[in-house]
Curated annotation (Swiss-Prot):
Name of the protein this chain belongs to: Putative 3-oxoacyl-[acyl-carrier-protein] synthase 3
Entry-linked InterPro entries: ACP_syn_III_C (IPR013747), ACP_syn_III_N (IPR013751), Thiolase-like (IPR016039)
Top-rank taxon: Bacteria
Annotated localization: Cytoplasm
Pfam families, alphabetized: ACP_syn_III, ACP_syn_III_C
The keyword Lipid biosynthesis appears for this protein: yes
Family: Belongs to the thiolase-like superfamily. FabH family.
Pathway where this protein functions: Lipid metabolism; fatty acid biosynthesis
């Protein structure tokens, strides 16, 4: 699916991560059982070093409120002027009601501000931006997009294959109506591979072997039960390496934007080696493809792209391509124009006493 919008702009982005910081080197004994070779390999190939993890009492709404309040104050936005609050997450505070409605209360928003969730993972920022642009194209004026996860809650802390890979973080993005600003999106999904990245148990469906295409996800281990995240890492890597470059080429062709006019190509930061492989396949310049979020924050799911935008030293006006791939399986790319983008250094959330 490809589409174009011309009425919306991204005015600002803030990202909040929890205060508990973990360094992978400190987990040599507790997580890696003194397997120094595996630890060094994960650091080198995936690009891991540090990550931030929520405690049991910190959820998406807490980080989202922190990021949102900082963003709205920084942009001097009246909360009553917001038309919609969208929360994109796969780790909601509650099954019911939506995290957006709960956050609506925490932010003390007007009853005229509609609030709803979108269930998306690593590609979620693109899906959230797509919906926000659609709503503004139809007449809305200001939309607050909250995007991110606390996936560490679904992973046993001693699972050395997954625990070091995922960090927690939530972004807040303000999208506003403007006179003219082109934005191009390309999105896709393939549900045949729904079980390649999945939490089998915990919702309404009872997990049974005949539901899944992948028999191995029903095989539990000491540090992975059915309530924990399962990832077929090899297949996810291969499919991402196929889908993201294809999506990137399609969005460039659809937008008719010359690659030379794009300042940054931002790929979901799930694996430093994967980003390097995509960059090489597409023959992109190193200085246009930042690849450092894994080292500082690990895989932030839907929050990785907004984190990149906050961490980059961007000019006053620039074009960027954004691409992501994740659970669903779902993926997408966009070519966006930015002007006077408001960002702050990554915020550290401290639990209110």
């Amino acid at each position: 699916m490809k589409t174009r919008f011309d009425k919306a702009k991204i005015s600002g982005i803030c990202v909040s991560v929890p205060e508990h910081k973990i360094c992978i080197d400190d987990e040599l004994e507790s997580v890696f059982s003194n397997d120094i070779k595996t630890l060094k390999r994960m650091k080198k190939v995936i690009g891991l070093n540090t990550r931030y993890i929520c405690d049991e009492n910190t959820c998406v709404s807490d980080l989202g409120k922190h990021a949102a309040n900082t963003l709205l104050q920084g942009l001097n936005i009246d909360k009553n002027s917001l038309d919609a609050l969208i929360v994109v997450t796969q780790s909601p505070d509650f099954f019911m009601p939506s995290t957006a409605c709960y956050l609506h209360q925490l932010l003390n928003l007007s009853s005229k501000t509609v609030a709803f969730d979108l269930g998306q993972a690593c590609a979620g920022y693109l899906y959230g931006l797509f919906v926000a642009h659609s709503l503004i194209q139809s007449g809305l004026g200001k939309i607050l997009l909250i995007c991110g996860d606390t996936l560490s809650k679904f992973i046993h802390p001693k699972n050395m294959n997954l625990a070091p890979i995922f960090g927690d973080g939530v972004s807040a993005t303000l999208i506003e109506k403007t006179d003219f600003n082109e934005a191009f999106f390309e999105l896709g999904s393939d549900g045949k591979y729904f079980d390649k990245l999945i939490i089998p148990k915990g919702a309404m469906r009872i997990p049974k072997a005949d539901i899944f295409n992948d028999d191995s996800l029903m095989q539990t281990e000491e540090f992975r039960q059915l309530e924990n995240l399962y990832m077929d890492g090899a297949n996810i890597f291969n499919m991402a390496l196929e889908c993201e470059p294809k999506s990137f080429k399609e969005i460039l062709e659809f937008s008719k934007v010359d690659e030379k006019d794009i300042a940054f190509h931002l790929f979901h930061q799930s694996n430093a080696y994967l980003v390097d492989c995509i960059k090489e396949e597409l023959k992109l310049n190193d200085d246009k493809v930042p690849n450092f979020i894994m080292e500082k924050y690990a895989n932030l799911s839907a929050c990785s792209l907004p984190t990149l935008l906050c961490e980059l030293d961007t000019p006053k006006e620039f074009k960027a391509s954004l691409s992501a791939f994740g659970a669903g399986l779902s993926w997408g790319s966009a070519v966006l124009n930015f002007k006077d983008l408001y960002t702050k250094n990554i915020l550290i959330y401290t639990k209110e006493k």
